[in-house]
């Protein structure tokens, strides 16, 4: 049988590296359909760090899309597993027949599902993408995203699957010894990307708690973001005293990021779509509750796993946050479906579906 090809169609180094390492470490040894990749972006040592994989790199979205389309047309038995997507040319190829529905399997990462950009180019493209998405062979996504997708594409098959967040399962049972009293520390956003709506989030936190909490804003990723970081910092200083505002402009290594998260009492995420699952997982693992926008469908996944969820529309205070911490501490984190290694079973099933081994 023709080997399944995995496609990382946009140059998002952090996520692409996570996916490649997960496949190299957890899937490649047991499945021949977990080894072939086409990636938009630079190698930057990925080939050396993922020796179990065969990875072909392309300088950009356009060249990658052209190569995928050529392979799809040359062999209609060739199947592709698209991780995230973010590549307009591939959507247009699916819509026009360059890639057939039977060749197209898509793991939704969030951004290609929601229509949040206001630019004219995007508004013109969204209806075409919506039509193309009706032709996907099967989508894989979180419970919330599956529900969202099914509202407009009820005939497309959907299967539960979680992004392979880098986690250490041994930390699931580690007690968080942080003092749960006194001034609270609140994490705002999961990166420096504008989709986090940092300024609106800072205003919302201030409206709920005033200048009585310490706010930490991680903005070290993406790079070359200095102007926006300064914009957020100045907006924050209009709301919070200097001692209560910490805007991080440097990218943190994983262990340092983990240490930062464990110093927090609450995560605050105002964005209205599913994103930042990795940060949510690490916070939950550390016993730290999260505030979500009610429009963010990931709350469905959290409640399905019996996790407490706070919403941006709730009246929040320290007592409510402490109660959510208590509830979270009582959850057996080894049973959470979107934690490592539990999500591995979903990936094994996804490969079987994409290759036709499971109907």
Swiss-Prot record:
- Report the domain of life of the source organism: Bacteria
The protein's UniProt keywords, in alphabetical order, are: Cell inner membrane, Cell membrane, Glycosyltransferase, Membrane, Transferase
Q: Which GO terms describe its cellular component?
A: plasma membrane
The reply to whether Ribonucleoprotein figures as a keyword in the UniProt entry is no
The GO biological-process annotations, alphabetized, read as:
enterobacterial common antigen biosynthetic process; fucosylation
Q: Tell me how this protein sits in the membrane.
A: Peripheral membrane protein
- Function, in words: Catalyzes the synthesis of Und-PP-GlcNAc-ManNAcA-Fuc4NAc (Lipid III), the third lipid-linked intermediate involved in ECA synthesis.
The keyword Nucleotidyltransferase appears for this protein: no
Q: Which family does the similarity line name?
A: Belongs to the glycosyltransferase 56 family.
Gene Ontology MF annotations: 4-acetamido-4,6-dideoxy-D-galactose transferase activity; fucosyltransferase activity
Protein's pathway:
Bacterial outer membrane biogenesis; enterobacterial common antigen biosynthesis
Gene name linked to the record? wecF
Q: Which reaction does it catalyse?
A: beta-D-ManNAcA-(1->4)-alpha-D-GlcNAc-di-trans,octa-cis-undecaprenyl diphosphate + dTDP-4-acetamido-4,6-dideoxy-alpha-D-galactose = alpha-D-FucNAc4-(1->4)-beta-D-ManNAcA-(1->4)-D-GlcNAc-undecaprenyl diphosphate + dTDP + H(+)
Compartments, record wording: Cell inner membrane
What InterPro entries does the record tag this protein with? WecF
Q: Spell out the NCBIfam families in the cross-references.
A: PRK02797.1-1, PRK02797.1-2, PRK02797.1-3
What is the enzyme's class at the highest EC level? Answer: transferase
> What protein am I looking at?
TDP-N-acetylfucosamine:lipid II N-acetylfucosaminyltransferase
Annotated Pfam families: Glyco_transf_56
The EC code for this enzyme is 2.4.1.325
């Amino acid at each position: 049988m023709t080997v399944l090809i995995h496609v990382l169609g946009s140059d998002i180094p952090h996520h692409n590296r996570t996916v490649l390492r997960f496949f190299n470490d957890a899937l490649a040894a047991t499945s021949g359909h977990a080894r072939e990749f086409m990636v938009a972006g630079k190698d930057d040592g990925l080939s050396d760090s993922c020796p179990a994989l065969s990875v072909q790199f392309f300088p950009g979205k356009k060249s990658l899309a052209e190569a995928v389309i050529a392979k799809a047309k040359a062999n209609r038995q060739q199947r592709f597993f698209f991780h995230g997507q973010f590549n307009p040319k591939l959507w247009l190829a699916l819509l026009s027949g360059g890639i057939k529905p039977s060749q197209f399997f898509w793991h939704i990462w969030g951004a290609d599902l929601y229509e949040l950009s206001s630019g004219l180019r995007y508004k013109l493209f969204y209806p075409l993408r919506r039509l193309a998405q009706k032709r996907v062979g099967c989508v894989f996504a979180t419970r919330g995203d599956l529900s969202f997708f099914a509202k407009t594409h009820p005939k497309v098959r959907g299967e539960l699957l979680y992004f392979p967040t880098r986690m250490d399962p041994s930390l699931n049972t580690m007690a968080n010894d942080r003092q749960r009293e006194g001034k609270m520390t609140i994490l705002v956003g999961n990166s420096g990307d504008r989709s986090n709506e940092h300024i609106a989030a800072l205003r919302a936190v201030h409206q709920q708690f005033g200048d009585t909490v310490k706010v930490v804003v991680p903005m070290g990723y993406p790079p070359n973001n200095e102007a926006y970081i300064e914009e957020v910092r100045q907006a924050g200083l209009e709301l919070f005293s200097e001692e209560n505002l910490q805007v991080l402009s440097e990218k943190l290594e994983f262990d340092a990021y983990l240490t930062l998260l464990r110093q927090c009492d609450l995560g605050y995420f105002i964005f209205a779509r599913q994103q930042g699952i990795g940060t949510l997982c690490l916070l939950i693992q550390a016993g730290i509750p999260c505030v979500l926008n009610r429009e963010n469908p990931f709350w469905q996944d959290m409640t399905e796993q019996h996790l407490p969820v706070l919403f941006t529309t709730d009246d929040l205070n320290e007592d409510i946050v402490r109660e959510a911490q208590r509830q979270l501490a009582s959850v057996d984190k080894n049973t959470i479906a979107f934690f490592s290694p539990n999500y591995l079973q979903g990936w094994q099933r996804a490969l079987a579906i994409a290759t036709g081994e499971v109907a």
